Amino acid sequence: MSLIVVRTHSFLFVLVLLLFASVFHSVDSQVFNPNGRYGRRDSASALSDASENKESSLGMKVYREISQDAQMENAEDRQFENQEYQS
């Protein structure tokens, strides 16, 4: 009887541990590395890779999405630099 209890508890412990690891990885990748969906730290290198593959429809979709992200980052950088320059 006690062997069944130990096996059940061990199985449940491993199951909860895997669930925790999965949730932690998901939150970690979204919070600490928001550009991680491209496997890059900056959008410029991702944009250059996507531009090489833009012949395919998926490559073109990724190219557009990354170029929009890059434009938004550049606009935010310019706005921040203007605020620093004015103050």
Swiss-Prot record:
> Where is the protein localized?
Secreted
Signal peptide range: 1-29
* Residues covered by region (Disordered): 32-54
Q: What is this protein called?
A: U-scoloptoxin(23)-Er1a
Going by the UniProt record, its keywords in alphabetical order are:
Secreted, Signal, Toxin
Q: Which domain of life does the UniProt lineage start with?
A: Eukaryota
Under the GO molecular function aspect, what terms does this record hold?
toxin activity
What family is it from? Belongs to the scoloptoxin-23 family.
Where is this protein chiefly located? Answer: secreted
> Upper lineage ranks?
Eukaryota, Metazoa, Ecdysozoa, Arthropoda, Myriapoda
Its Gene Ontology cellular component terms are: extracellular region
Expressed in which tissues: Expressed by the venom gland.
